[in-house]
């Protein structure tokens, strides 16, 4: 199958399926806050300026999807915090890429609002996608999409 054959829509595509679950604005902002250590409902509501009913429904959905665990931290009154699961933590790269894109193409005159400091070396990090086989940076120009084992071409409508 030629590369150009993959340029049309195809059934079950991973990006589309993922965006169906986490592509909504508030969901991505809740994830960002969680990556930066915010776990409690009230702090999420204050930091984001999100309506409380909207926050409740998004958190409920994120728990149902397995991206957060709802964990009690107080019994009187009963209160819960929201902790990222492994599946939730694995979305970190997506948030960082969006942050980097915003810094590059929607810059603020005073510079980036958030910088990431790497714990191991103590320097500001500039995260990149790296090939685990050769160590080269991965870009849209040096990879080729190929059908994977789950590929199913979308049938054209008659």
Curated annotation (Swiss-Prot):
UniProt source species: Mycobacterium tuberculosis (strain CDC 1551 / Oshkosh)
- Stored Gene3D superfamilies: Winged helix-like DNA-binding domain superfamily/Winged helix DNA-binding domain
One Pfam annotation, family name?
HxlR
Keyword Iron-sulfur tagged: no
Sorted UniProt keywords: DNA-binding, Transcription, Transcription regulation
Q: Which GO terms describe its molecular function?
A: DNA binding
The UniProt record lists the HTH hxlR-type domain at 13-110
Name-wise, this protein is Uncharacterized HTH-type transcriptional regulator MT3179
Parts of the chain that traverse the membrane: none
| SUPFAM superfamilies attached to this UniProt entry | Winged helix' DNA-binding domain (SSF46785)
Question: Taxonomically, which superkingdom?
Answer: Bacteria
């Amino acid at each position: 199958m030629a590369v150009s054959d993959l340029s049309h829509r195809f059934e079950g595509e991973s990006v589309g399926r993922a965006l169906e679950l986490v592509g909504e604005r508030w969901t991505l902002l809740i994830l960002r806050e969680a990556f930066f250590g915010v776990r409690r409902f009230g702090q999420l509501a204050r930091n984001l300026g999100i309506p409380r009913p909207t926050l409740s429904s998004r958190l409920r959905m994120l728990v149902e999807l397995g991206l957060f665990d709802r964990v009690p931290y107080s019994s009187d009154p009963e209160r819960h915090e929201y902790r990222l699961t492994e599946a939730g933590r694995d979305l970190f790269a997506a948030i960082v890429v969006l942050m980097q894109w915003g810094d590059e193409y929607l810059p603020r005159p005073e510079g980036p609002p958030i910088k990431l400091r790497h714990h191991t070396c103590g320097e500001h990090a500039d995260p990149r996608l790296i090939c685990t086989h050769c160590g080269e940076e991965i870009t849209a120009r040096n990879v080729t999409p190929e059908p994977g084992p789950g590929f199913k071409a979308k049938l054209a409508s008659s």
